[in-house]
Structures are given as C-alpha cells and as structure tokens.
Amino acid sequence: MNCVTGAKRGVTACVILMTFGVALFASATASRAQEHAPYIGIGPVTSAPIGWAEFCVEYAPECDTTPSVPRDVVLSTRAWTELKRINIAVNTSVKPMTDMDHWGVVERWNYPDDGYGDCEDYALQKRKVLMQAGWPREALLMRVVRDHNGNGHAALTVKTDSGEYILDNQTNDVLSWADTGYRGHRERAALARYAARRPVNAARQVAG
C-alpha cells in the first residue's frame, strides 16, 4: 500500500496517534473522548488485504483467530494514556518509506524493525506493542480506509467500551472514527468478528 504521505503535525508516515499529559488532563481528555466515540458499523465480511494474508502466513501465532477474551476494553484513564504514549512512540521512532523502496515489492506488511515502513507497518507495530502490554488481540483491528485524498490507507482500530479509536501515523492524536474524516473500511477478515462484547479492563491487563 503506497501510503507514505506528507507529515501532519510534525509526524511523518501513515497510521496511529498520541500525546503525553498530566493525570488531570488525561482524565478530562478521556472523559470527553468517551462522549463522542461511536462504533464503526460492522458490515459484511470482506476478503483480507493480500498484505495481511501474507503477514499471517509469516506470523501465524499473531493472527490466531480463537477468541480468548472479550473484544472491548474499558477505556480507563490509564488505558487512554497508554494508547497515546504508544501511538506517539511508534510515530516518532519509524521513518516513512514505501514498500517498493523498502522491500522491492509493491505490497508487503511487516514490522518496521529497521526503523522504516509505511502506514500498515506503523499500525502493525502499534498492535504488537499494545499486545505486549497486555491488550487483548481481539480488540486491536487492522483496517484499510480511504484517506482525505481518496487513497488507500491502513490504520489500527482499538475497540473499547466507549467506542472505537483510530491510531494513525498521520497524527499524534488518538481520534474516534467519526473524527478522522476517513471513508469506508475493510476490517481484517482473519479475526473472529462476533466475540462477546463484555468489556475487559485494559488497565488491569496492562498492569500485568
């Protein structure tokens, strides 16, 4: 996916968000976000992007579709702060590079271990770091959308009890789907889509 675009708010690359703040600010921000974060409508199951399918061949354990925990997490102040921290950390540590320049192929989804990647690689890295921090895999969805210019763009969606939030390499802000301005979406099909909707306390899981 050729999604290496111009920097937005000082962040270079393609998908997922964040900023540090004192506890009081984080609490107020989380409260406001909870009021305006709708769920993305679940449409018919679509075929997974070829890049995701190939990624799951190479990293099969990370694509296990067996639901082990409910998909939604409780958006506590701690969880909100962690989302923002990880989003910013990945956005600032990875530099944008197209798959053709990086791998010599038109499309490849992989981790930006060498410090370079395009939008889906940012999203994959954020997903990986969140899972390592204890977030349930079933709450972290890879999505392909149309950006503001009508181009294909990959991003990470985090499902919470307060709505769905987008971690995007084009901004350091964690936004609700409604606030991104993106159009359409393809949810990765390699995920059990109808897991129980009882919330999981992300803060407890993150505490490990």
Regions found by a protein language model. Give the residues of each.
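Helix-centric, low-specificity signal for extended rod-like, repetitive segments
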Residues: 1-2, 25, 119
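N-terminal secretory signal peptides that target proteins for export/translocation
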Residues: 1-9
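Short hydrophobic "helix-edge" motifs at membrane interfaces and signal-peptide entry regions
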Residues: 10, 19, 49-51
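Bacterial N-terminal signal peptides
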Residues: 13-26
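A structural boundary/capping signal
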Residues: 30-208
